[in-house]
Regions:
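NAD(P)H dinucleotide-binding glycine-rich loop of Rossmann-like/cofactor-binding domains
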Residues: 91-171
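Mid-domain Rossmann-like dinucleotide-binding core that forms the NAD(H)/NADP(H) cofactor-binding site
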Residues: 138-219
Length: 343
């Protein structure tokens, strides 16, 4: 089968190759891939910033498809099902985290598209436990965004709980920020989305998605806008989705005393300067959130089924598998929102 592989560490080092199809084991499901979203992790792997623990490996982990084969022990999934899948492929099954189904925290976890061959391919293998059958109202294109949506669900509804009376600030109008804003808005909260001048098209898209206020922080005073909408208190919750240290430190003083700051974006450096004074003096709860877990997926699919998340406006380009490089170049250019590769 055709597959896009990271063949060795370093910049690019990616090729479209023909590799053998994997055999389905007893508890596994073979999926004919329909669409795969290009994730920031895929881009960082392309540029060599993300250090894979294993190469060569087929990339791709945000996918949808149709089941073509199931293992003999599989009982809940059948051939012909339209599905998406969690990225978790291997866990120890014994640690405290696995016993609570917090697979995202298992020290022995291996994920599809990073350590295990992923979905930038004609077919992908997943374990039955990770596979979710799509509701009838969710199409294969929308389903390819379930994984990043589940990450946003985990951040907003599991690591903390957004309430309808909350005033919420979100940094970063990229795919994650736009999904995060929609998840928060679906709870009835008031949402302010902050970006920079080059994000103008994304901020305009956010307005069309129902986001209450968008701010170009290079042209407008974010502090003034936040304090105006919150009667001077600051926001109840802040989701930092850009992975920019400047946004982190600009945001902390804008959180209400006793408010919550959720770090969704990943920083390029392990250690960064942090406005500790704001956290301490304002009694801010600073929360880290990593990936997603099974419960996140159930909620994400429900949101998609109820049409509370608009994926159509976010998917701005689709390229065939053979032209995967055009898709990556489109993401790197910064001119697209979400790019899918069609297998």
């Amino acid at each position: 089968m055709k597959a896009v592989m990271k063949v060795e560490p370093g910049y690019d080092k990616m090729q479209l190759k023909t590799i053998p199809e994997l055999e389905v084991q007893k508890n596994q499901v073979k999926i004919k891939v329909a669409y795969t979203g290009i994730c920031g992790t895929d881009i960082h792997t392309f540029t060599g910033q993300y250090k894979n623990s294993q190469t060569p490996v087929v990339l791709g982990h945000e996918f949808s498809g149709i089941v073509v084969e199931v293992g003999e022990d599989v009982t809940k999934i059948k051939v012909g099902d339209k599905v998406t899948s969690e990225t978790t492929f291997v866990t120890c099954g014994e640690c405290d985290y696995c016993l609570e189904k917090d697979y995202n925290l298992c020290a022995h976890r291996k994920g599809i598209g990073t350590q295990i061959n992923g979905s930038f391919a004609e077919y992908v293998i997943s374990r039955e436990e990770s596979v979710h059958v799509l509701p009838d109202a969710v199409d294969l294109k929308a389903a390819a965004l379930t994984e990043p949506l589940a990450c946003c669900v985990h951040a907003a509804l599991e690591k903390t709980v957004v309430k309808k009376e909350d005033k919420v600030l979100i940094f970063g109008p990229g795919p994650i920020g736009l999904l995060q804003a929609q998840v928060v808005k679906a709870q009835g909260a008031f949402v302010i989305l902050a970006g920079i001048t080059k994000d103008q098209k994304r901020l305009e898209l956010a307005k069309s998605l129902g986001i209450d206020v968008t701010v170009d922080i290079q042209k407008e005073s974010l502090e003034e806008i936040v304090l105006t909408y919150t009667k001077g208190y600051g926001v109840d919750k802040l989701f930092e989705c850009s992975g920019a240290v400047q946004a982190l430190n600009q945001g902390l003083p804008l959180v209400k005393k006793k408010g919550t700051f959720v770090q969704v974006g990943i920083f390029s450096e392990k250690l960064n300067l942090l406005d500790q004074e704001s956290i301490i003096q304002r009694e801010i709860t600073y929360i880290g959130t990593r990936s997603q877990k099974p419960s996140s997926w159930h909620i994400a699919l429900k949101l998609l089924e109820e049409k509370k998340i608009n994926t159509d406006k976010m998917i701005t380009k689709i390229v065939p598998l053979d032209y995967w490089r055009q898709g990556f170049e489109a993401v790197l250019s910064g001119n697209e929102i979400k790019v899918l590769i069609q297998s």
